[in-house]
Amino acid sequence: MAENAGNETKLVENENLQEDLSRLNLEDEKNELKLNEKGGVLKENDEHLECSESFKKLAEKEEAYQTLKNSYNSLKQQHSNLLGKVSGIKSTLGERLKKDSQELAQNRKRIQELEKSLGDAEEALKLSNEETVTLTAQVESLTQDITDLRQQNASLVEENQLLSTQSKQWERRARDEHEMQESLAVRLADCEEQLARETERQEQYEVEIQRHLTNQHQLEIELESTKASHTENLGELTRNWQKAMDDVTEKFASKSKEYEDLQNELDATQKRLSRVSDLEHEVKEKTLLIGKLQHEAVVLNEHLTKALCMLKDGNNAEKIDKQLISNLFVSFLTLPRADTKRFEILQLISSVLDWNDTQREQTGLQRPGSSVNNWSIPHSASSNSLFSDHSFSKRRSFHDS
C-alpha cells in the first residue's frame, strides 16, 4: 500500500510538470503574437507620420518597442532556460517513469499476490466465523447446562437444609420420647409402690372390717345378754353401732374406688410403656436431660414431702411452712398462664391451707356443687409424682402433635 501511494505521488508530480511546460509554451506564443502586432503598428505609423509629433511618437514607440524587445529577449532567455529545465526534467522524468513503471508492474504483481492472500484470508475468516457460530452455540448450551446445574445445586442445598431441620426435629422428638419414657418408668414405679401401699391398706381395712364385724358380733351378743336390763340404752347403742358400720362401709367404698382408679391408671401406664417400647429404637442414641425441670421437680418434691409429712402429723395439722407457701406462690406467679403446672401448684396450696369449698370455687379449683374429694391431693407417692405427671403431659402433647 505504501508503494502504491508513492507511485501515485510520482504520477501526480509528472502531470504537474507537464502542465507547467504547456503553460510556458502558451505564454511564449502569446508574447510572439504581441510583438508581431506591435511591429505592424509601428510600420504603419512610420508611413503616415509626417510631423515632429509623429517623430516624437515614433521615438516613443521605438523606445517602447525596444523595451518590449528587451522584455521579449528576457522572456526568450527565460524560455530557453525553461526548455533546458524541461529537457532535464524530461530526461529525469523518463528515467523516473521507467523506474516507476517497473515499480508499478512489481506493485501490481504484489497487489495480485496480496489480493490472493486477501481472498485466502477472507476464506479463512469465513471458516473462522462459522467456527465462531458453532462455538457460540456450544457456549450457550454450556451456559444453559451451568444454569441448570446451579438450579439443581440450589435445590439440593435447600433440600439439605430441610432434611437438616427435619433431623433436628426428629432428634428433639427422640429426646422428648426418651424423657417421656423415663418419666413413665418413674411414674410406673410410683404407681406400683402406691398400689402396694393401697393393697396393704386394703388388707388393713379388711382386717379392720373383720375386727368391726367381730366387735359387732360381740356387741350383738352383749346386746342380747343385756337387752332385758339395758332396754333404755338400746337406742343409743343401736345408733352407735349403725354409725360405726356406716363409717366403715364408707371408708371401704372410698378405698375400693381409689384401688380401682389406681388399677386403671396402672393399666393405662402399662399401655403407654408398651407404646414407648415400640419407639425405643428411634430414641436409642438421642438422650438429653432437662436440668431446669429436674431441679424444680427436686425442690418442689422436697417441699411436697415436707408438707405431706406435716399433713400426716395429726398434732401439727394447723402448722404451715411459710417457706413452702412462699415458694409455691413464687412458682405459681412466675409460670406462664398456659402452663398446667399452675393448676397443680394451686391444688397443693389449697391442700396445705385447707381451703373450704367456697374458696376452691372462687379460685377455680372446684365447680359449684362438686365434691371436695374430686380435687383432693393424693398421698405421698402420687404427690411426689405431681410434676412428673405434668412433664409427661407436656411431652405427650408434643408427641401427638
Curated annotation (Swiss-Prot):
GO terms for cellular component: Golgi apparatus; Golgi lumen. PROSITE patterns: GRIP (PS50913). Residues 315-366 form the GRIP domain. Keywords: Coiled coil, ER-Golgi transport, Golgi apparatus, Transport. Residues 7-296 form a coiled coil. PANTHER family: MYOSIN HEAVY CHAIN - RELATED (PTHR18921), THYROID RECEPTOR-INTERACTING PROTEIN 11 (PTHR18921:SF2). This is GRIP domain-containing protein C119.12. It comes from Schizosaccharomyces pombe (strain 972 / ATCC 24843) (Fission yeast). The lineage of its organism: Eukaryota, Fungi, Dikarya, Ascomycota, Taphrinomycotina.
